[in-house]
A protein has these predicted regions:
Chain A
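C-terminal transmembrane helix and the adjacent membrane-cytosol boundary/short C-terminal tail
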Residues: 411, 415, 419, 426, ...
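Membrane-cytosol interface at the C-terminal ends of specific transmembrane alpha-helices
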Residues: 338, 342, 346, 387-427, ...
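Membrane-topology segments of multi-pass transport proteins
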Residues: 1-16, 36-306
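Transmembrane alpha-helices
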Residues: 432-470
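Transmembrane-helix boundary motif in ABC transporter permease subunits
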Residues: 324-356, 369, 377, 528-536
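Interhelical loop and adjacent transmembrane-helix boundary motif
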Residues: 304, 466-517
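Membrane-interfacial helix termini and adjacent extracytoplasmic/periplasmic loops
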Residues: 37, 287-308, 343, 348, ...
Length: 541, 327
């Protein structure tokens, strides 16, 4: 081969290695980037007046005076939307209009009976009322504008009638007038479509603005408030302005998503300007403000994490990790000390080392199985406790998982202590134990601490071992270590896969994972800093 | 007279005191000796916790799996592809699950091994120490990210992307799981094989360069062959990570227990052993057949990883011997 081709190959090879590493780093950024950036939006975001309402109702937090002033301002703007829709519905919702007319007719009949009338008068008025009712019903069912006009004019003839003054029958004329006004503007053939679309808009408005003032408060917290976040409000606005439909292109072809403007659909009606109105006044209705919601880290959440934070999850994770550290730290340090300082290199020690390595290689789900079989189903009943998964069993399981990590890190730390330290101590007459406790251990402490932090971060992120030994997705904050707990890791899993409600609050989904990752990465960063410091100190650079 | 006698007796005693560290009387020596032994044996016992743990893990997994192994023929367990534990006539055929595990692991290794070796070569032979000290912690970050976070990424980001951009019928499939698993096993592969490649001494490199070889030739013809057992150990350790991983495969593989057909179609959903344990265990009654069958899968998994672990240790000890011999 020519030397130039060889050098070309060499260059290509170098480029490939560079490329590989760049791809790996890009992957890291691609994985962390969206999770962290979307996760931050759980804490820093633009909230709306609905968020402030929710904070006061659920967490008793915020300024009530200010809020009621804001409520007043927004209510005026919102009311106009409701009024427009109600007006429009008078011309469309023939079903409910018919119902209304029937109710009025019944009421009139009752009033009529209480009046002092001759039988002849009674039958006359009664038949007129019946006539009015039937005419109106014909008008509501009709698609023909002329017919409607005819019916309504017929009905309106009686509006001046002395017999109906001050009775419920006056409502007939109000409804009739309203309906005629509305019917003039609307395309009657589209009545049905309009009714459906208005229903959708009303549902979306409930999502955006919360339940209508005066309406009964829904039972679940998630339905009691409108869009609590500005980004959410905007996406709902988009849904209000644009109608999305899956339209078929023909047999065998996949459906295609189309977007049509709702304003076009309602062209020529009194609702048409409403869309512009909502769009222009969204800010005045929602009053967005930049918020740093640090309480996300301490708040409890409503079921499904729709509102609130991840306080119990963080507490659960901390409890689990700290409790397991309580078992791991002494065991790990003593094992490492024995293996490095006291043990001779014989067969038994080799077996111990193989066991430690095997333990490090055991899949995490096996630890879960073992924890279930041993700690939950065997150990707890053996001590007379109820055999159910709890924090105690979960942390014991995790501590076995973390043991090899701890032993290895401590061994490394103890090995890096220069032998001159030990020799000096031994030469001064100290025994093996005293040398270890007063010289080697303090010198190795930063390294051991690194090991502690590394095993902490490993334990904090593990999910599989605690699946059957103490983690739950929903539940109260534990009051003792013999109860199961929510954790960040299991919560992240549950919100990504198990919970349908969580799909509606992506910021909370990402927020929990991001918190877990930040927690673990911070622990790792501390470990790295400690390690470099120790390295510098012991090697005198 | 009395005083002189005391002096005579006291004098040697004072002499002894002076040399106390060197000359102990019998009881003193015994006490210290016993103390040392006692202390050491306590330490030894505590150290044996890990051995005890391994033993207990084996004991309890086998104990829970044994009734199942007795009742069902292992032949059916390994050859039947039907995993229908809840059916009226339950079937516990683990073949599809075993194949699923192997399938994602091998696919993950196809991505991860070349990338890992290239990255290891990059770190040890291509860049300066300064770049290396920046890049290495970044790669170690990949190992620090919790597996559930990878699973989350697979479900929330990668799966929708695959479904919309690549036109797969489902985003949670073998390819998705394999990609994430390969990213997860990369740090292990990189750091172990980098250690092996760095352990090949300067002498070999310099002699190769002196003979006129380029860097690529040196690496492919000299260094990688010399470090091959370390690299094999790295691959095995990476495989262990992939085989034993639970959360990612559970979330990203689609959990359809079947053998992919056609075999090369990565866009199909599959199910692995770990995901089956994680997914089914929550719903079974303790002590039922299904429960025991899951433990049997666990036992199989444990045996596989243990064998892989011993294999990796064998290869690692070979590298240690080789590099020791070179020095």
């Amino acid at each position: 081969m020519k030397i130039t081709t060889r050098s070309h190959f060499d260059k290509i090879f170098t480029a490939v290695t560079w490329l590989t590493v760049l791809v790996i780093i890009t992957l890291l950024i691609m994985i962390l980037g969206p999770i962290l950036s979307k996760g931050t939006s759980a804490v820093i975001f633009r909230d709306t007046v609905e968020f402030r309402k929710m904070q006061i109702t659920l967490f008793r937090r915020g300024n009530e005076m200010k809020l009621s002033a804001e409520k007043k301002q927004t209510a005026a703007v919102r009311q106009k939307i409701y009024d427009t829709i109600d007006d429009f519905k008078k011309g469309i919702d023939t079903q409910s209009l018919t119902e209304q007319v029937r109710t009025i007719y019944r009421r009139c009949g009752q009033e009529l009976r209480r009046k002092d009338l001759t039988p002849q008068q009674y039958t006359d008025i009664r038949s007129t009322l019946k006539d009015i009712r039937d005419r109106l019903e014909i008008a509501f069912a009709s698609k023909d504008k002329a017919e409607i006009a005819e019916c309504v004019t017929y009905v309106m003839k009686f509006s001046g009638d002395e017999n109906f003054k001050g009775t419920s029958a006056e409502d007939f004329f109000v409804i009739a007038a309203d309906f005629q006004k509305a019917a003039k503007k609307t395309d009657l053939t589209k009545q049905h479509l309009y009714a459906e679309s208005v229903g959708q808009i009303e549902d979306l408005l409930t999502l955006l603005l919360g339940p209508r003032p005066g309406a009964a408060l829904p039972a679940t917290a998630m339905n009691q408030f409108g869009a609590t976040r500005w980004d959410l409000a905007q996406s709902i606005l988009d849904k209000i302005l644009w109608k999305e439909q899956w339209v078929s292109q023909g047999d065998g072809l996949p459906l295609v998503k189309t977007r049509t403007q709702r304003a076009e659909e309602f062209a020529g009606t009194e609702i048409e300007p409403l869309f512009g109105y909502i769009k222009d006044n969204l800010k005045t209705m929602m009053k967005p403000k930049l918020r740093f919601y640090w309480q996300y880290l301490i708040d409890d959440s409503t079921p499904g994490h729709y509102f609130g934070g991840i306080g119990p999850e963080i507490i659960g994770t901390l409890l689990l990790t700290l409790l397991s550290m309580l078992f791991v730290i002494p065991l790990g340090i003593i094992s490492a000390a024995y293996l490095t300082e006291f043990a001779s290199d014989n067969f038994i020690i080799k077996i111990i080392r193989v066991c430690i390595n095997s333990l490090a290689g055991v899949p995490s789900i096996i630890f879960g199985l073992f924890g279930l079989a041993f700690f939950v189903l065997f150990l707890l009943p053996a001590f007379g406790a109820a055999s159910k998964p709890c924090i105690f069993t979960a942390s014991l399981t995790l501590s076995i998982l973390a043991l090899p990590v701890m032993i290895r890190a401590s061994e490394e730390a103890i090995k890096t202590v220069p032998s001159t330290y030990k020799e000096a101590s031994l030469a001064l007459g100290a025994g093996k134990f005293r040398t270890f406790i007063s010289v080697t251990l303090p010198a190795a402490m930063p390294g051991i601490l690194t090991g502690v932090i590394l095993s902490l971060s490993r334990v904090a992120g593990e999910t599989a071992p605690i699946l059957f030994t103490g983690a739950i997705a929903l539940g109260p904050v534990p009051s003792s270590i013999f109860q199961s707990t929510r954790t960040l890791s299991y919560g992240s899993y549950d919100m990504a896969v198990g919970d349908r409600l969580a799909m509606m609050v992506p910021h909370n989904q990402y927020g929990m994972v991001a918190t877990l990752i930040i927690l673990v990465l911070c622990l790792n960063a501390i470990a790295i800093v400690l390690r470099t410091r120790l390295f510098k100190k012991l090697h005198g650079h | 007279m009395n005083e002189a006698k005391i002096n005579q007796v006291a004098l040697p005693a004072a002499d002894v005191l002076k040399h106390q560290p060197l000359v102990l009387n019998y009881s003193q020596g015994l006490g210290r000796c016993l103390g040392l032994y006692l202390g050491q044996s306590i330490l030894f016992l505590i150290t044996c916790t890990s051995v005890l743990s391994v033993f207990l893990i084996f004991f309890f997994i086998i104990k829970e799996a044994l009734p199942f192994l007795r009742e069902f023929s292992p032949a059916e367990f390994f050859t039947n592809t039907g995993w229908y534990p809840q059916a009226e006539k339950p079937q516990f055929g683990a073949l599809a699950l075993i194949v699923g595990s192997i399938y994602v692991t091998v696919t993950a290794m196809i991505f991860a091994v070349p990338a890992g070796i290239f990255a290891a070569v990059f770190l040890s032979d291509v860049v300066s120490f300064k770049v290396q000290s920046v890049v290495k912690p970044v790669i170690e970050l990949l190992a620090a990210i919790p597996s559930v976070a990878y699973g989350f990424f697979a479900v929330m980001v990668l799966a929708p992307w695959m479904q919309h951009r690549l036109g797969f019928t489902t985003g949670v499939n073998a390819l998705n799981a394999a990609i994430i698993l390969s990213v997860m096993s990369l740090p292990t592969i990189i750091s172990v094989s980098q250690d092996a490649i760095s352990a090949v001494g300067r002498e070999l490199r310099e002699s190769s360069y002196a003979l006129g070889a380029t860097r690529m030739e040196t690496i492919f013809k000299v260094i990688i062959p010399a470090a091959h057992s370390g690299i094999i150990a790295a691959i095995i350790l990476g495989m262990m990570r992939a085989v034993g991983e639970t959360m990612v495969v559970w979330m990203a593989s689609g959990n359809a227990s079947r053998i992919p057909h056609p075999w090369w179609d990565l866009s199909l959903s599959i199910r692995t052993m770990t995901a089956t344990i994680a997914g089914d265990m929550g719903e079974t009654a303790k002590g039922s057949e299904h429960y025991r069958a899951l433990f049997a899968i666990g036992l199989l998994l444990l045996v596989i990883t243990l064998c892989l672990n011993l294999l990796s240790e064998y290869f690692l000890s070979r590298t240690a011997k080789k590099t020791g011999a070179l020095k």
